[in-house]
Amino acid sequence: MKNSHWNATEPDIKTIKSSFDNPINALAQTETPAFIIRHAYNPNHCAELIERFKHFGFMKDAHRSEADKRPRIDIGTSLGNLGSNPEKFFKHAKSTHLLFKFLFDGFDNPLHCIYQNLSELCPGKNVRTARENDGSKYGPAIIRIHYDGQRYKPHIDHVVLRESRTKFSVHRFKHQFAGVLCLQNADASGPGAQSRLHQCLWTPKIQPYIETETFSDYAKENRIKNCQVKLSPGDLYFFNTQLIHEVPAIVGNQPRVVMAVFIGSSPEDDEIAVWA
């Protein structure tokens, strides 16, 4: 489907699959900036899961928040944070798998929500958590809690182009994507801006503008289109992480909470690998 205005494709899997024969390939070719699946997860369970995270002590204590200066808290294992020490990374990932076995008890499993919807976008592919040849599994997803002031400047996410993690099996994939499930917005009054996706794939030519934080000027001068993704709790979206993208700063006392994954795919590979 031609997308001359470069808008996200939404609001459900049926619309996405009727628009593209091979949705994941359409994302790879940036025919659309994102797939948004509204109400993919039960919004009522989102609020109750947040309460569970608080009860387990995963979030800042409201009575001590001024003393706790952390801009972000992660529940889960991040290759970006721990990949420099593979032994520590896989040990930590094993603990995450154990935690996620009971963390969502009594609720619809948000992890299953992401994986099942991803499978719908990848016809003929086997979606599973990434692993090494020896069977060591990566973390299946990560829950990120973003507090006041936390933002992400224009950047890309890529195990090779950005992080050069060529010792890990996921470096073999030609394309990398992300899936983000909104559990709570910073602004509880309505839809919140989760990201701005620019119609610009990373190249070495673009890197100087990222390093000098002048990409916004470059985008204006070159009339690069962008798509702003706004989600409500329970909404899920997928996008190509080689697109230059940014996330606005959190404002206020209520954190933004998401469950996120990275996704690896190659046309000739039957596997779709998922990790965090």
Regions found by a protein language model. Give the residues of each.
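Short, flexible loop/turn elements at secondary-structure junctions
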Residues: H39-Y41, I142-Y147, H158, L181-L183, ...
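Catalytic core of non-heme Fe(II) oxygenases with the double-stranded beta-helix
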Residues: D148-C227
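N-terminal auxiliary "cap/dimerization" subdomain that precedes the catalytic jelly-roll/cupin core
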Residues: M1-K101, D105, N109
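Catalytic core of Fe(II)/2-oxoglutarate
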Residues: Q207-A276
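Generic detector of solvent-exposed, compositionally biased contiguous segments
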Residues: M1-A26, R144-D157, R223-I244
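Extracellular structured ligand-interaction cores
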Residues: T32-A34, Y138-P140, K174-V180, G192, ...
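Signature of the catalytic double-stranded beta-helix
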Residues: N85-D148, S164-R165, H171
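Catalytic micro-motifs at enzyme active sites that drive phosphoryl/nucleotidyl and oxygen chemistry
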Residues: P23-I24, V127-E132, P248
